[in-house]
Amino acid sequence: MVVGEITQQRNLIIIGGGPGGYSAAIRGAQLGLSVTLIEQADLGGVCLNKGCIPSKVFTHAASKRAEISHLADLGIGSGDDTFNLSKLLSYKDEVISGLRSGVENLCKANKIEVIQGKATFLAVNKIGVENGHQFDIFEFDQVILATGSKPVMPKWVTNKGKRVLLSHNIFSLEEIPEHLIVYGQDYIALEVASSFAALGSKVTILFDKESEQVFDESIFKELNRLFKRRK
């Protein structure tokens, strides 16, 4: 491993290149700070690359397919009602790539240094960034941690094989499952459930009654009513 000989100075270091991280980086640069943004995976974070945006693409496709199924009721022939998952996956990748390029261009326009690597604190005002065989050291005035979150696997899930999916990888499936069990009740879980149901899966939603409700009681009741109608 090659260790940088010079400790580099920055006003602001941001660890995490998701919406929180790159938005803070842009604002810091606009205020005249020297900013370095560190992301160990793809710029845009989980939201853009594996979570929110892929979920919205699938939800949009599902809503369009649901519209087609009702055209016959209006006397409109819908032709061959087929669904091509590979085309949807290609479209999803195009959307993600375009949005990621937009974030990259925003960072360039604001003169933000973007480093792909893993950051480790060496002192209260110093970090090391590992990128392959390179290890660079930075001292900073301020640091923002925007590392995001990751799904928590329920304790009762003991078999973590290929059939157990997370919100981070379900939108990369190469075929629509015949039966899908969704555990959770936040908006991502409900988007997964509704989109895969519209695309052909038989979907069952599971959640703990004891867990805190994500939505207001009236919204929860309305969602429950709508999902029951779609059985």
What is each stretch, according to the model?
Residues 2-10, 26-33, 38-176, 209-213, ...:
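Glycine-rich flavin
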Residues 6-18, 176-186:
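Beta1/beta-strand and adjacent pyrophosphate-binding region of the FAD-binding site
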Residues 11-37, 190-198:
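N-terminal Rossmann-like FAD-binding beta1-loop-alpha1 element of flavoenzymes
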Residues 13, 128, 202-204:
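A generic structural signal for ordered secondary structure
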Residues 18-22, 42-43, 151, 171, ...:
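Residue-level detector of alpha-helix initiation sites
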Residues 163, 174-210, 214-215:
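Rossmann-like NAD(P)H-binding beta-loop-alpha module
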